[in-house]
């Protein structure tokens, strides 16, 4: 049993790495077509092997270590952020995959909070002004949205009475939580976009203000690892959007392919949002979470607690 | 538990191998003073690279700390409310959430949530 669990975790982690590679291709292609151009189409057949070429290029690229950098933590931070992004994938529930035990969402909360440290370290140990400013912004944004995210997560788990992701997916066999918790679902998606520092909330690397934000000093392998971690987080957030609010799809389709299709669609939504909206304003971002989401999430949570208690008898 | 530990170990190995791979096969090249200085637009960086930042960010972290502790206290509620026969999970969580909400409105009223004054 243990071996099977371990094997399924490792397989979903390796598949996640592959998915990350091709998700970057999807993003470049998609953004290309949004802007009425082709995107990468020269490598191989229609640009399909492009991610592999990118990987080779990034790993063989020269590694610049600026003199002021604290070298060891500077190199460890990207590896740590990829590590944390991949740890989450053991929670992935597919048709074939046996999930981890009853406290999987607790593991998610812990690991996703730790992700802040790698961003903070990447900025701080770079010893550069742009990197520091970018990482400070990124940390403030992440921790703010973490509050509302954990409360929304709790509102979903409340309906099931368990902290296990596989349990909440099983409970949605007949009806989706999205029907009960519709506004929570919308808020969860926006929080996910903000938590992963994606456009329109990409203040961690606002190109026009800070050169590239917290990863300004990175190139080569460091940049590659940070990039993979970011996209791994995006894909896992898409998985969570589907698992928490549309969990029943794991039973739909041949071998549960419904889940993969829905997750790809949510991943596509991240790109779509990026192509459609201009960058938000930082103070508005903070108002959105503290003055709008947090009071409404707390109120809805109170309502849910009472209704669950009454309906439970 | 053991499964997760072994999984973490495997991931650690994957990450270290990726990092070492990048460190070993990267293209060597010359390095000079300009190239190795932190990225700033064409001039030498001043000494204070780790510049002081706005107090807002620190205050935000303090507020976050309070809310995060409260979330930790709320987490057991998820399994208690369905699995208990008494009204205590309901009553205590309602009192707790009300205090949390009033606390948030108090912060708002006092202006600690305002990003720009």
UniProtKB/Swiss-Prot annotation, chain A:
One of its GO terms (biological process) is aerobic respiration. It is an enzyme of class 7 (translocase). The keyword Translocase applies. The chain crosses the membrane at residues 6-26, 71-91, 105-125, 149-169, 173-193, 220-242, 255-275, 293-313. Pfam families: NADHdh. It is found in: Mitochondrion inner membrane. This is NADH-ubiquinone oxidoreductase chain 1. It comes from Heterololigo bleekeri. The gene is ND1.
Swiss-Prot record, chain B:
Its main location: mitochondrion. One of its GO terms (molecular function) is NADH dehydrogenase (ubiquinone) activity. It is found in: Mitochondrion membrane. It catalyses: a ubiquinone + NADH + 5 H(+)(in) = a ubiquinol + NAD(+) + 4 H(+)(out). Its EC number is 7.1.1.2. It is a multi-pass membrane protein. The chain crosses the membrane at residues 4-24, 57-77, 88-108. Keywords: Electron transport, Membrane, Mitochondrion, NAD, Respiratory chain, Translocase, Transmembrane, Transmembrane helix, Transport, Ubiquinone. GO terms for cellular component: mitochondrial membrane; NADH dehydrogenase complex. Core subunit of the mitochondrial membrane respiratory chain NADH dehydrogenase (Complex I) that is believed to belong to the minimal assembly required for catalysis. Complex I functions in the transfer of electrons from NADH to the respiratory chain. The immediate electron acceptor for the enzyme is believed to be ubiquinone. Belongs to the complex I subunit 3 family. This is NADH-ubiquinone oxidoreductase chain 3. It comes from Heterololigo bleekeri.
